[in-house]
Amino acid sequence: MTAREALRAGLMAALRPALTPLGVSLFDAVPVRASVPQAVLGEPGDSDWGAAGIEGRELRVALTLTDEGEQPRRLRLCVQAAEAIGLAGVLADGWRVAGLSMTGTRMAKTGARWTASVEWRARLWRVGQ
């Protein structure tokens, strides 16, 4: 399993219990048909982050949240819930989390819909693979 796949699986596992109580449907790809509120975890971009004998990757990934309404009250709660998640220390296939930090959030209204994004940087490593 790649670092990208391990990170996506770990984030999905952490986000689901944070967002489900708020009525948000979580997807790992843009759904063809889905009602709001919804959240879509994007594809991570990655780069090398390792040392001698250690395989490491630095990944950046964004969660896009969509809702409707006059004001983004529920969307703000969703962003707060996403900001508060943490990852398990060990992910799939031996990938270990060296760090997870939120790098930014954004919110905007287009027509009747509000869209927010939460972006993270993760550093993962493993030995002997």
Where are these regions (language model features)?
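Short acidic/glycine-enriched loop/turn segments that link adjacent beta-strands
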Residues: 34-36, 112
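Charged, amphipathic alpha-helical segments and their flanking helix caps
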Residues: 1-29, 43-129
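Charged, often glycine-rich, active-site loop that binds/positions anionic groups
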Residues: 36-44
